[in-house]
C-alpha cells in the first residue's frame, strides 16, 4: 500500500536510486512529475530492480494531485517546513494507499502539493540541515515499510513485472 512520488528531479542518478529503493521496500509504483530519463541513464543506479516498479509520469504537479484525489491516495511530503512534524514520532495510517513525496533537489516540494499533503521532516542532530532527496526517500520508505511490517498483513513478496525488461512508463495528463 505504498508508492513514491518524485518531483522534477534534476539528477538522473537520484531517480535511479529511488527506483532501487522503491523495489527493495516493496513500493508498488513511482510517480514522476516532470522528466523521466531514458532507461540507460538510470539503469546503473537502479540496478536490475528497474523492472519491479511501475513508473507513472505526470507533466505537472496538478495532474498528479488530480490522480491522487481520484485514487484516494494519502499524500505525505518530506519537506523542511514550519508546518512539518517529525517523522520519528509519526504513525502512518495504512487505511488508504500511502504516497510518499520527495521534491526537487533545490526547490523541494511545490506549494500546491504541500497544501494537499501531510508534511513530515527528518530530525537531524548533526551539523547538516538536509539530506540528498534520494536519501530522504530511503528513510521515509524504511520507516513506512517498518511500520507496515509491524501489521499482520505484511507480505514481502515483490510483484513481478510482466513486461520483462521494459521500463514501464505511463504518461497521464489531466484525467
Predicted regions and their residues:
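Post-transcriptional modification and biogenesis factors for structured RNAs
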Residues: 1-175
Amino acid at each position: 500500500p505504498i508508492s513514491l512520488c518524485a518531483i522534477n528531479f534534476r539528477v538522473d542518478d537520484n531517480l535511479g536510486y529511488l527506483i532501487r529503493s522503491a523495489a527493495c521496500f516493496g513500493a508498488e509504483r513511482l510517480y514522476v512529475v516532470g522528466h523521466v530519463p531514458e532507461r540507460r541513464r538510470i539503469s546503473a543506479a537502479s540496478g536490475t530492480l528497474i523492472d519491479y516498479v511501475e513508473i507513472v509520469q505526470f507533466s505537472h504537479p496538478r495532474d498528479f494531485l488530480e490522480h491522487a484525489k481520484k485514487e484516494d491516495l494519502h499524500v505525505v511530503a518530506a519537506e523542511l517546513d514550519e508546518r512539518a512534524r517529525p517523522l520519528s514520532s509519526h504513525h502512518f495510517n495504512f487505511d488508504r494507499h500511502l504516497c510518499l513525496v520527495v521534491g526537487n533537489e533545490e526547490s523541494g516540494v511545490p506549494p500546491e502539493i504541500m497544501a494537499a499533503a501531510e508534511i513530515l521532516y527528518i530530525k537531524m542532530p548533526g551539523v547538516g540541515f538536509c539530506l540528498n532527496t534520494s536519501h530522504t526517500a530511503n528513510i521515509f520508505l524504511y520507516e513506512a515499510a517498518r511500520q507496515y511490517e509491524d501489521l499482520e498483513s505484511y507480505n514481502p513478496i515483490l510483484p513481478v513485472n510482466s513486461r520483462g525488461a521494459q521500463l514501464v512508463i505511463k504518461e497521464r495528463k489531466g484525467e
